[in-house]
């Protein structure tokens, strides 16, 4: 590493990069939920385990980044010691771009008036500072993506720049007892919302916010109960045969809040990722999971001090942005490059997961009546759950043992709805006490 090729321009301004970033961000008004919903927590030993963050439920290990398996199912490569992962990005000026700035520099040096000189210098500074700004925002974007994934999934995979090909898998320990599927497969019902509210009430918690993907909210607005909810709010008279139009987002969210005393927070955030020179836009929030919260603050943004911050490399210019982002500028040769490097030790940590409730709307989450097998069961003796056949009387008995009211002569539809209304923990208990019938 050598000093920047344009040291005469950046030596005075680079330490003030933090001010430039904030000034440039203001008009854009980028929104970052991780900055609103996480409290910054400093870790003196560069570990997230020993901080004031509540990590009672958190478990972490190292896994392969490129495995096709879902994050939760990837095999463990090593045990994590709680070290904060290094997150960062680089912006590089190559020879063509360096030559372009050199031409600006020549114009600056040959300018005949102070005004012209000032204008040329500003052009050069803008070009050089933009990369620092991009690195700072890039780290924010990664933090936002990590946060949205963590909050919706309960599990996060963060690539560590110091360990190529592996990533830190953090499982925040979302409770199976607080995770539910939809009662009717593929549809979110009024009863699904009430089901989760009842569980929270039983736990002594009060749900205040529902975070949901825009696409999922659009699906919900089309449901009959959603249309009726808004029609009732508008004091409309209707019957079961009345066609009710799909309500607007604003009307439905207001009616929903009036009905359940829960505010809807719509998530529709995209983040651009770059790999092997290819950019791809991705929405990190899992649209199939609706997350119910009891607090606006859901955890900590744990950060540490980079070794390079206390052991600076000679010739490299450094700037600190938002306390934890270290932005450096330097040049290299063979080939000639001007590099801006942004790095940080940071991890969003979801806390108080006993106050987080999830409605998993994915197709594989809820079961449905197996109509083909039901036709063959002329005596109505069995109920099929997730492809396995059980004695219906046994299923009903176990549902009653879990406190679920089901009639002795309940139809398969009613039994399946009762099974779908269970939390993950209850469903596991139910199936463990049943014996599949050949």
Cite the ranges covered by each PLM segment:
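N-terminal alpha-helical "arm" segments
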Residues: 1-49, 355-367, 436-438
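Short linear loop/turn motifs
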Residues: 25-29, 38, 48, 269-274, ...
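Assembly/oligomerization interface modules of large self-assembling protein complexes
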Residues: 34-111
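Long, contiguous amphipathic alpha-helices that act as assembly "spine/axial" helices in icosahedral shell
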Residues: 85-174, 200-216, 336-345
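Long, low-complexity, charged/polar intrinsically disordered regions
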Residues: 144, 176, 389-392
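Extended, solvent-exposed, turn-rich assembly/linker loops in the middle of proteins
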Residues: 164-241
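Sequence/fold signature of self-assembling virion shell proteins
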Residues: 227-397, 438
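Basic helix-extension-helix modules of the SAP/HeH family
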Residues: 372-438
């Amino acid at each position: 590493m050598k000093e920047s090729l344009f040291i005469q321009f950046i030596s005075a301004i680079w330490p003030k990069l933090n001010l430039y970033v904030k000034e440039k961000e203001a008009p854009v008004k980028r929104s970052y939920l991780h900055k609103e919903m996480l409290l910054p927590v400093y870790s003196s030993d560069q570990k997230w385990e020993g901080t004031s963050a509540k990590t009672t439920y958190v478990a972490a290990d190292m896994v392969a980044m490129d495995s096709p398996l879902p994050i939760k199912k990837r095999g463990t490569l090593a045990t994590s010691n709680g070290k904060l992962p290094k997150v960062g990005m680089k912006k590089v000026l190559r020879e063509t771009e360096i030559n372009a700035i050199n031409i600006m520099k020549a114009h600056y040096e040959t300018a005949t008036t102070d005004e012209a000189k000032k204008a040329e210098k500003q052009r050069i500074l803008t070009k050089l500072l933009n990369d620092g700004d991009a690195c700072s925002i890039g780290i924010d974007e990664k933090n936002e993506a990590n946060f949205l994934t963590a909050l919706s999934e309960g599990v996060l995979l963060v690539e560590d720049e110091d360990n190529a090909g592996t990533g830190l898998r953090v499982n925040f320990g979302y409770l199976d007892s607080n995770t539910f599927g939809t009662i009717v497969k593929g549809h979110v019902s009024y009863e699904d919302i009430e089901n989760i509210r009842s569980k929270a009430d039983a736990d002594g918690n009060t749900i205040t916010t529902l975070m949901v993907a825009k696409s999922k909210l659009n699906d919900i607005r089309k449901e009959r109960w959603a249309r009726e909810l808004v029609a009732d709010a508008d004091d409309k008279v209707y019957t079961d045969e009345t066609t009710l139009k799909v309500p607007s987002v604003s009307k439905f969210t207001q009616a929903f809040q009036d009905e359940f005393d829960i505010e809807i927070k719509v998530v529709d955030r995209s983040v651009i990722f770059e790999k092997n020179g290819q950019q791809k836009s991705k929405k990190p929030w899992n649209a199939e999971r609706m997350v119910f919260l009891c607090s606006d603050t859901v955890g900590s943004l744990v950060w540490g001090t980079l070794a390079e911050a206390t052991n600076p490399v000679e010739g490299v210019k450094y700037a600190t942005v938002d306390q934890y982002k270290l932005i450096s500028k330097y040049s290299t040769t063979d080939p000639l490059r001007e590099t801006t490097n942004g790095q940080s030790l940071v991890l969003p940590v979801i806390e108080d997961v006993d106050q987080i409730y999830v409605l998993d709307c994915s197709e594989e989450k809820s079961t449905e009546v197996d109509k083909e097998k039901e036709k063959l069961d002329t005596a109505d003796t069995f109920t099929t759950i997730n492809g396995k056949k059980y004695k219906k009387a046994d299923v009903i008995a176990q549902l009653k043992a879990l406190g679920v009211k089901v009639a002795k002569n309940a139809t398969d539809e009613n039994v399946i709805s009762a099974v779908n209304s269970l939390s993950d923990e209850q469903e596991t208990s139910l199936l463990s006490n049943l014996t599949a019938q050949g």
